[in-house]
Regions:
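ATP-dependent adenylation/nucleotidyltransferase module used to activate substrates
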Residues: 1-153, 164, 174, 180
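Active-site and channel-lining beta-strand-loop segments
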Residues: 128-129, 216-230
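Glutamine-centric residue-chemistry signal
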Residues: 148, 193, 247-249
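Internal nucleotide-binding/catalytic subdomain
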Residues: 154-222
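Single conserved hydrophobic/aromatic residue that forms the stacking wall/gate
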Residues: 239-250
Length: 250
């Protein structure tokens, strides 16, 4: 079977490519360029960096599989970054990874797989697709510590037959062992937890740079007592805090 593997440059997607190749599949590696600097360059910090792309290229070379980098920066900016800024401007807290999976990654990967005559798209997510009552369902990974089904919940039923999550039954330590046994340079690479287009920077500065927040305000409790101030709703997340003697919302 010809399978398109989404390669991020991390150990998980590297092992997916290696496992599928070892099982005799015809594997094609693809990395999405989603975010770029002012001069069109890939970022140097966070995830989805130039170094990550280079790591993916080296893994593909080691495995002797074709490898491509595809530019989806326009789609990512329109669907993910704009949504991220807009939601914070409304006082909401977005999850950009969920929106990226919903409106960018899987649609484009499935479309690209079709163009390359691939039957499936495989990713390094920790989740499972299980057949139940003649239909496919998204389930949690066996290794719950790394389960990522929550960022995949938006996958529609028509997409599931076209997707494979080979790591759904494998633990993270096992993944690293497999990578080491295959001689992959990503075997002990650290996992990235950063928002790819924010990196190590403060997300509030990123949002402020893209929209004008000129109004500060008070933070009040349920009795309208002022308990603090804020510099704009984008700096706050909607939470509810309860204590024995007082309650407030932010």
């Amino acid at each position: 079977m010809r399978i398109l593997v989404a390669m991020s440059g991390g150990v998980d997607s590297s092992v997916v490519a290696g496992l599928l190749k070892s099982q005799g599949h015809d594997v094609i590696g693809v990395t999405m360029k989603l975010w770029e600097g002012p001069n069109g360059e890939m970022p140097e910090t966070g995830c989805c960096t130039a170094a990550d792309s280079e790591d993916a290229r080296k893994v593909a070379a080691k495995l002797d599989i074709p490898y491509y980098v595809l530019d989806y920066t326009a789609s990512f900016s329109e669907n993910v970054i704009n949504n991220f800024v807009d939601m914070y401007s409304q006082g909401l807290t977005p999850n950009p990874c969920v929106e990226c999976n919903r409106s960018v990654k899987f649609d484009h990967f499935i479309d690209q797989a079709k163009k390359l005559n691939c039957e499936k798209v495989a990713t390094g997510h920790y989740a499972k697709i299980v057949r139940s009552n003649n239909s496919l369902e998204l389930h949690k990974a066996d290794y719950l510590e790394k389960d990522q089904s929550y960022v995949l919940h938006m996958l529609t039923a028509d997409k599931l037959p076209k997707i494979d999550f080979p790591l759904g039954t494998i633990s993270k330590p096992e993944v690293r062992q497999i990578a080491a046994s295959l001689g992959l340079k990503t075997a002990f690479k650290k996992d990235s937890q950063d928002i790819c287009f924010v990196g190590k920077k403060d997300y509030r500065n990123f949002v402020s740079s893209r929209i004008d927040f000129s109004s500060s305000g008070d933070i009040v409790d349920k009795d309208d007592n002022i308990i603090g101030t804020h510099e704009g709703v984008h700096e706050l997340s909607l939470i509810h805090i309860s204590e024995p003697t007082r309650q407030w919302q932010i």
